[in-house]
């Protein structure tokens, strides 16, 4: 089979001058450059200077003539070889020859007299005509290539029809072999065309069509063979017709992409970001208005209508079957908050119009002041929409975590039923499989709805469409196998559709993972594993073997998915300390924690499954379950180590949520102290906004000190320098303590805060020991005294931090009323002032004075005020103590280094590295190979290619067309 008999229709206007391939563009570019240079040789009017000949112009004219001659030779060769566009190509070659001759004469005359505007105008018109003629010749040559591709497509279509019309298996094998040969040829030609296409969307369409053709061609033979062998089974015809349709659509896709025709409506539906994400983006843009021109009648209805549309979409997500009750409540609460924030914002706009308060004398340029009420209202509105986005993302991630768990189980159950030949059972499991497939598609579309990743959304929607169309055919293959369970052909057909389904589900899973945040995934997975751990413990205590087995399986599946996704994520980063730490946590979970958990599950199920339940160590199971949760949490902590504070802020609600849930579960520890059913951290999170604002001010000051410490320790390599290691440890613990005052972080109760303070004191003691050793070796007495003075500060502030944490422990709740145990607090402060006095008396007066006394004074900590004010005072005292300690650590690190340099200067190069610690500059941090892109950056992303100022031949050609003749 070598040629097609029916005519080939080219969906391309030969008169069009649209350049569609990179080859045509690259061939045309030199000629455009030469002509442009020639025309611009003299762009000035008549001159009073003596006229003369321009050697450069003559050289350029000759180069244009030579380039035209090359086009003529190539064009004549293509015209001789072409079968379909021979006449058009010959005509185009003659036109180029004619326009080339005109251009040669005009350019020669212009080169002789470059100052003549008339001759210049004549040459411009000739150049325009020549470029148009050459462009048309190249496009016709490009069309000839497309015609050759379409000829191959026609041959493949005929071969496909021959396969479809095969009457027996032997005939099918022969015809399919011929079809395979033509497929190889077509794939080669299509791949070349794909590389040539200029439009990236057309290249994507070509790649997708080629992939679909290759994928379905492998299914074509088994589906056709099953139909020929079992033509009496209706499902076999459905399988065969489906595969043929897919192959035909792939061939049509190659044809459309090769000709760069407009995509179908279905493909256009796949483009664009998520509907809900787009609506939120547009709403965020619309709320920023010019206050001086604000009109309530004009803007209020529009903004309210947009918001209600967004809330309707959020409500649909909240009402979905897989949305958890607590998540639904949060979405509803955020919707109400957004509504209220919009009303507050509109009120501020009206107030500004009424009273003109938006601009003051110092900002008449129109710039909003930071503390302006309108600016605050806009920020609040933006924050509320961001909070709503976060809850919607978490809701979608809830769905993904549940639906994309053990995705192959419904399929395996269906196949096992089919192998047994039980058609009734197959139909029952087919319904389960269909519901599972529908759920995957639904969840994928939900993920798309809130994603700003346009390319990722397109891939997810295309993969979901494939899942939707493939699902009935998998069921048909199962029905065929159920009808003929002993048939090898039916089994092979089932295996092919099974493999195709699993591949497509993997594609969909990876596509969904690409448009969702790893941080959101870890946050939700951690929460779900905690829920499952609690269910396991309850099932264990109640002796419910089925629930225990099923839930333990879910835990294993969730943990395996966490490990897989994080390992894949780390491949995007260059190997370094960060990736090593993350991979260590995943390795620990997969190789140590999960095997132990599986072993304990097996022991528990075996003990409970006997007629007489056997006793076993319940605490061992609980510990193994707890380790799974802790392992996932450690992975999440390791992943978040390089996140910015802004990125970590999005996880703030979950930080509060998971620990509070944990404190009320069956795996809570003995030190989980609760006040009226709430942890101390939860109580801190419920403080009034005014109190939170005051705490936030203190935290901001603390962060300033922290940034100083970060800058200092970032200079040094901590290998061989325990002072830097201890400084980092103290910084991390102090961050956790300040997070506690805001109702966040891992510290949950007052006992946790006390333990954290003890750890800081221990680290401070170790730092004191090391730094004193450095001071002892320092020959410079001034540096030595400075270092010792800073060490005294550390001792003082560690003691102060201990006191502030212990004072919080004296706060108890009796009968719902917050009181403070005065005895404990008084004794604590008595001890403190004695120690503080000794420290200050022993230090240098220039370094330490009475102003270093702790900020957590007696009056601020005794419960004379309300519960909220008491909590506020203790919180601010804790933050101030941490800030003071942070500052002392910074000064100690600096002084230790200075003291070490003095030691080196005195004792020479033999002591470059101190016996106590080694001061080595830290190597530059390694950057990820692939930049992590925030979802909101996809809209505003600028591609590198667009930054280059490159004028395409088409643009230059259009400039010639726009030039006026002289």
UniProtKB/Swiss-Prot annotation:
Q: Does the keyword Cytoplasm apply?
A: yes
* Biased segments, Basic and acidic residues type: 924-940
Give the GO biological process terms.
Answer: axonogenesis; brain morphogenesis; cell migration; cell-cell adhesion; dendrite morphogenesis; regulation of synapse structural plasticity
Domain of life according to the entry: Eukaryota
Q: Where is the composition biased (Basic residues)?
A: 941-951
State the annotated membrane topology for this chain: Peripheral membrane protein
Subcellular localization: Cell membrane; Cytoplasm; Cytoplasm, Cytoskeleton; Cell junction, Adherens junction
Instruction: Identify the stretch(es) annotated as Disordered.
Output: 924-952
Q: Name one GO molecular function term.
A: actin filament binding
Which UniProt key words apply to this protein?
A: Cell adhesion, Cell junction, Cell membrane, Cell projection, Cytoplasm, Cytoskeleton, Developmental protein, Differentiation, Membrane, Nucleus
Give the CC-aspect GO terms: actin cytoskeleton; adherens junction; axon; catenin complex; cytoplasm; nucleus
UniProt similarity note: Belongs to the vinculin/alpha-catenin family.
The free-text function statement in the UniProt record for this protein reads: May function as a linker between cadherin adhesion receptors and the cytoskeleton to regulate cell-cell adhesion and differentiation in the nervous system.
Q: What is this protein called?
A: Catenin alpha-2
């Amino acid at each position: 089979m070598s040629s097609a008999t029916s005519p080939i229709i080219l969906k391309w206007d030969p008169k069009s001058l649209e350049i569609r391939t990179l080859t045509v563009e690259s061939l045309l570019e030199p000629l455009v450059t030469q002509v442009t240079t020639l025309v611009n040789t003299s762009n000035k009017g008549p001159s009073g200077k003596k006229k003369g000949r321009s050697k450069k112009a003559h050289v350029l004219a000759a180069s244009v003539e030579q380039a035209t001659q090359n086009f003529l030779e190539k064009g004549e060769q293509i015209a001789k070889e072409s079968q379909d566009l021979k006449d058009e190509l010959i005509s185009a070659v003659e036109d180029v020859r004619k326009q080339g001759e005109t251009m040669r004469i005009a350019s020669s005359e212009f080169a002789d007299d470059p100052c003549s505007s008339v001759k210049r105008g004549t040459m411009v018109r000739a150049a325009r005509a020549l470029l148009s003629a050459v462009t048309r010749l190249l496009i016709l040559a490009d069309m000839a290539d497309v015609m050759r591709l379409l000829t191959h497509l026609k041959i493949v279509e005929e071969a496909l029809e021959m396969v479809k019309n095969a009457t027996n298996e032997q005939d099918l094998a022969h015809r399919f072999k011929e079809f395979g040969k033509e497929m190889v040829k077509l794939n080669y030609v299509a791949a070349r065309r794909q590389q040539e296409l200029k439009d990236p969307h057309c290249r994507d369409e070509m790649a997708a069509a080629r992939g679909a053709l290759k994928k379905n061609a492998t299914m074509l033979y088994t589906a056709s063979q099953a139909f020929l062998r079992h033509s009496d089974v209706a499902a076999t015809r459905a399988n065969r017709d489906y595969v043929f349709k897919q192959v035909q659509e792939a061939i049509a896709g190659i044809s459309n992409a090769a000709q760069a025709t407009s995509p179908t409506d279905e493909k256009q539906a796949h483009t664009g970001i998520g509907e809900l994400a787009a609506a939120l983006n547009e709403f965020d843009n619309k709320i920023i208005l010019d206050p001086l021109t604000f009109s309530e009648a004009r803007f209020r209805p529009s903004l309210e209508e947009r918001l209600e549309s967004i809330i309707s979409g959020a409500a649909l997500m909240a009402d979905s079957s897989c949305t958890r009750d607590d998540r639904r409540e949060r979405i509803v609460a955020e919707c109400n908050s957004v509504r209220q924030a919009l009303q507050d914002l509109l009120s501020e706009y009206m107030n500004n119009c009424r009273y003109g308060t938006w601009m003051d004398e110092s900002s008449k340029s129109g710039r909003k002041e930071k503390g302006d009420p309108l600016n605050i209202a806009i920020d609040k509105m933006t924050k509320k929409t961001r909070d709503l986005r976060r809850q919607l993302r978490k809701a979608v991630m809830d769905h993904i975590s549940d639906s994309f768990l053990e995705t192959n189980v419904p399929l395996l159950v269906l196949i096992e039923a089919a192998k047994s030949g039980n058609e009734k059972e197959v139909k029952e499991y087919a319904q389960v499989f269909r519901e599972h497939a529908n759920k995957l598609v639904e969840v994928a579309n939900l993920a798309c709805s809130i994603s700003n990743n346009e390319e990722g959304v397109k891939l997810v929607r295309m993969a979901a469409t494939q899942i939707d169309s493939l699902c009935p055919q998998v069921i048909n293959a199962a029905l065929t196998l159920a009808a003929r369970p002993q048939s090898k052909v039916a089994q092979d057909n089932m295996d092919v559709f099974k493999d195709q389904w699993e591949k497509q589900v993997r594609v969909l899973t990876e596509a969904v993972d690409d448009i969702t945040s790893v941080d959101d995934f870890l946050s939700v997975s951690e929460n779900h594993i905690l829920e499952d751990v609690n269910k396991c413990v309850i099932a264990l205590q109640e002796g419910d073997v089925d629930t225990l087995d099923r839930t333990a399986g879910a835990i294993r599946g969730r943990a395996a998915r966490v490990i897989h996704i994080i390992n894949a994520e780390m491949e995007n980063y260059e190997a370094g300390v960060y990736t090593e730490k993350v991979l260590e946590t995943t390795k620990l979970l997969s190789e140590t924690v999960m095997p132990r958990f599986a072993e304990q599950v097996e022991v528990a199920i075996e003990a409970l499954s006997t007629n007489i339940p056997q006793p076993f160590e319940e605490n061992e199971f609980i510990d193994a379950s707890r380790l799974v949760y802790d392992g996932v949490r450690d992975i999440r902590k390791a992943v978040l180590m390089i996140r910015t504070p802004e990125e970590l802020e999005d996880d703030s609600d979950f930080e509060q949520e998971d620990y509070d849930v944990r404190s009320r579960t069956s795996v809570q520890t003995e030190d989980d102290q609760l006040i009226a059913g709430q942890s101390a951290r939860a109580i801190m999170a419920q403080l009034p906004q005014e109190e939170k604002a005051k705490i936030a001010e203190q935290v901001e000051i603390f962060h300033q000190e922290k940034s100083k410490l970060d800058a200092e320790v970032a200079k040094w390599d901590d290998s061989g320098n325990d002072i830097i290691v201890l400084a980092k440890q103290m910084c991390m613990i102090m961050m956790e303590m300040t997070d506690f005052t805001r109702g966040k972080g891992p510290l949950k109760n007052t006992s946790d805060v006390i333990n954290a303070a003890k750890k800081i004191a221990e680290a401070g003691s170790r730092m004191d020991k090391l730094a004193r050793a450095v001071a002892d070796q320092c020959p410079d007495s001034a540096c030595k005294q400075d270092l010792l003075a800073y060490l005294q500060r550390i001792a003082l502030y560690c003691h102060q931090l201990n006191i502030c944490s212990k004072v919080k422990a004296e706060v108890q709740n009796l009968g719902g009323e917050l009181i403070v145990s005065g005895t404990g607090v008084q004794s604590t402060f008595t001890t403190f002032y004695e120690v503080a006095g000794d420290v200050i008396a022993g230090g240098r007066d220039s370094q330490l004075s009475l102003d270093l006394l702790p900020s957590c004074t007696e009056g601020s900590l005794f419960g004379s005020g309300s519960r909220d004010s008491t909590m506020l005072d203790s919180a601010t005292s804790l933050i101030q103590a941490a800030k003071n300690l942070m500052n002392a650590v910074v000064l100690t690190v600096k002084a230790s280094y200075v003291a070490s340099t003095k030691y080196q200067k005195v004792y020479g190069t033999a002591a470059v590295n101190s016996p106590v610690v080694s001061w080595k500059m830290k190597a530059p941090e390694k950057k990820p190979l692939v930049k992590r892109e925030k979802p909101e950056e996809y809209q505003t992303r600028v591609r590198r290619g667009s930054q280059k100022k490159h004028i395409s031949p088409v643009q230059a050609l259009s400039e010639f067309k726009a030039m006026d003749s002289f």
